[in-house]
Amino acid sequence: MVGRGADDADGGWGAAGVGGRGKGGAAVSVTLRSLRFGDKDASRAREMAGRYTHAVVRGVPSSMAQEGDGQVDLARAQRESGVYCGILRQKLGLQVVELPPNEELPRGQLTGDMAVVIADTALITRPSVPARRKETDGLQKLFEELKFRVCEVTDESAALDASDILFTGTEIFVGVSKWTNLRGAEMVAKTYQDYAVSTIPVSGDLHLKSFCSMGGPDTLIIGSSDAARKALKMMEQLTDHHYETLTVPDDPAANCIYARVGPKSNVLVHRSAEEFPDSAQVFQKLTDYTLVPASCTEVSKIGGCLTACAILINRKLDI
């Protein structure tokens, strides 16, 4: 177990919080903070899970066509983005804050990589790729206008991508990956001190949410690959909380948006049957959900997914 030193000055981290590698350099999972929720706290967290009021998105720049080895169909990417924003407005009832496309930010549509918002705190991340760091410009002002407490990762040794952050409602899992290092995970634990925070090793070019997401207050949607199964096993070892799991054949299809609309309606935005027909069949088992298919074939070519295309927040204020 890895914990914050009680006497660390300036919110620093003791030697126990540095590392994350086992023998032979193999990545290991660690607990950065362990907390136990009481029944009342857990019930409140479940009630708030999937509750959103706003979404922050960015338009598709023409320069996106040069990404993904030039395989991106720009016109289709723009259509898919329009449908996606329509789903956020019409199916989830969100106020959508649209940032204009910026030709200097070819991957700028992936706003969900740039920040995570939990409770009253927004954490602006620090992408490991220097060329993407300008994508965070303007977010601090936006979050301040929404009356959030705003934190920003400024440590130059930290790398943090919000697509590696999975908030379950009661705890936080952070993928330590090509895109997020242990120092970045420590910044998450430092920012959200009311929640247990654990790290999950992720290999290759994947993010943690490349193969998992929340499908309800106590439900994890998980892919079927070895990477997904290993991550799920580590989560089960690290958590004190019980989660139901819904396993889908295709890892990318495990990345969904779960939202609660109104007092009782559960909505799941998932990848379309055109893209992943076998996984779409699995979602049909969720008979008490409103299922909303959404394609993101083009944004997936630049490493994106459904959750990466918006910053979802819960704030009952007008911008």
Question: Where is each model-derived feature located?
Answer:
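Acidic/polar hotspots within intrinsically disordered regions
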Residues: 7-10
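The feature marks the mature, well-folded catalytic cores of soluble enzymes
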Residues: 2-3, 13-319
